[in-house]
Curated annotation (Swiss-Prot):
Post-translational modification note: Phosphorylated at Ser-246 in unstressed cells and at Ser-287 in stressed cells. Phosphorylation at Ser-246 appears to be a prerequisite for subsequent phosphorylation at Ser-287. Phosphorylation at Ser-246 and Ser-287 are necessary for activation of EIF2AK2/PKR under conditions of stress.
UniProt keyword annotations, A-Z: Cytoplasm, Disease variant, Dystonia, Host-virus interaction, Parkinsonism, Phosphoprotein, Repeat, RNA-binding, RNA-mediated gene silencing
Assembly behavior: Homodimer. Interacts with EIF2AK2/PKR through its DRBM domains. Interacts with DICER1, AGO2 and TARBP2. Also able to interact with dsRNA. Interacts with UBC9. Forms a complex with UBC9 and p53/TP53. Interacts with DUS2L (via DRBM domain). Interacts with RIGI.
Disease connection: Dystonia 16: An early-onset dystonia-parkinsonism disorder. Dystonia is defined by the presence of sustained involuntary muscle contraction, often leading to abnormal postures. DYT16 patients have progressive, generalized dystonia with axial muscle involvement, oro-mandibular (sardonic smile) and laryngeal dystonia and, in some cases, parkinsonian features.
Compartments, as annotated in UniProt: Cytoplasm, Perinuclear region; Cytoplasm
Result when mutating S279A: Abrogates apoptosis induction under conditions of stress
Main location: cytoplasm
Name used for this protein in its record: Interferon-inducible double-stranded RNA-dependent protein kinase activator A
Gene: PRKRA
UniProt-reported outcome of changing D260A: Abrogates apoptosis induction under conditions of stress
Family classification: Belongs to the PRKRA family.
Length: 313
């Protein structure tokens, strides 16, 4: 599900003397990138950082549904999924498809040697983009912006936006939605920059403490269960994969949620998703002749993935 607000006509998406940038060429040059990564890199090059907002979150139903909106330049698209990450993934994918398919959409890449002082004062950073870059650099989930309040008279509107980054939350207010987002992001950046070196607490440790199980902590964990997984074969018959995954989750500090899919697979088998609250979130698919078998298969696939991640250096 996606929509676009862009209407202006422009030349095709190519990097030429006019200063435009080719999204298609970038995708070809960087295979294997996720839609979120591709769109972010595109936004960085065109000075149009993608901004993600959670529009809807239905977690009280059997299969949770999340809806995220991504805005990059004049393009706005939405995506739905059973996890926040999947919803963001689909929103980014929809935006990329529009950018690739619509030759009338073209962003100009500003000349770094000729900045526009009327749009951005010298040395002033974009706090929304800076916070997103910080999250990507440290492997955190991307910041989420939610419009929580809108009020005031027509000539003096005030917007309140909540920005969430892992377990942290900041609120920003402004005369426009964009200004409210900027203020919330600025508060986060100020909070992180105020962590003094005298306290011997790094920014990564402060936020990382709230992440639970990260790939870095998994690789360096002295835990008995995760190290046993590194040495074990996952093809031994009659192994209780659900129990084994549960023991590792308890040791490493993440939760497991099994989401049964109502629709049968193409070959008539039951399907299930195992969602691990690691950082980033891990979702693995499983199938079988029963719901229980599908869950066991999903747990098996999750264990295989954790084993690969834990063994990497």
């Amino acid at each position: 599900m996606s929509q676009s607000r862009h209407r202006a006509e422009a030349p095709p998406l190519e990097r030429e003397d006019s200063g435009t940038f080719s999204l298609g060429k970038m995708i070809t040059a960087k295979p294997g990138k996720t839609p979120i990564q591709v769109l972010h890199e595109y936004g960085m090059k065109t000075k149009n950082i993608p901004v993600y907002e959670c529009e809807r979150s239905d977690v009280q139903i059997h299969v949770p549904t999340f809806t995220f909106r991504v805005t990059v330049g004049d393009i706005t698209c939405t995506g739905e999924g059973t996890s926040k990450k999947l919803a963001k993934h689909r929103a980014a994918e929809a935006a990329i498809n529009i950018l690739k398919a619509n030759a009338s959409i073209c962003f100009a890449v500003p000349d770094p040697l000729m900045p526009d002082p009327s749009k951005q004062p010298k040395n002033q950073l974009n706090p929304i983009g800076s916070l997103q870059e910080l999250a990507i650099h440290h492997g955190w989930r991307l910041p989420e912006y939610t419009l929580s309040q809108e009020g005031g008279p027509a000539h003096k509107r005030e917007y309140t936006t909540i920005c969430r980054l892992e377990s942290f939350m900041e609120t920003g207010k402004g005369a426009s939605k964009k200004q409210a987002k900027r203020n919330a992001a600025e508060k986060f950046l100020a909070k992180f920059s105020n962590i003094s070196p005298e306290n011997h607490i790094s920014l990564t440790n402060v936020v990382g403490h709230s992440l639970g199980c990260t790939w870095h902590s998994l690789r360096n964990s002295p835990g008995e269960k995760i190290n046993l997984l590194k040495r074990s074969l996952l093809s031994i018959p009659n192994t209780d994969y659900i129990q084994l995954l549960s023991e590792i989750a308890k040791e490493q500090g993440f939760n497991i949620t099994y989401l049964d899919i109502d629709e049968l697979s193409a070959n008539g088998q039951y399907q299930c998703l195992a969602e691990l609250s690691t950082s980033p979130i891990t979702v693995c698919h499983g199938s079988g002749i029963s719901c229980g078998n599908a869950q066991s298969d999903a747990a098996h696939n999750a264990l295989q993935y954790l084993k690969i991640i834990a063994e990497r250096k």
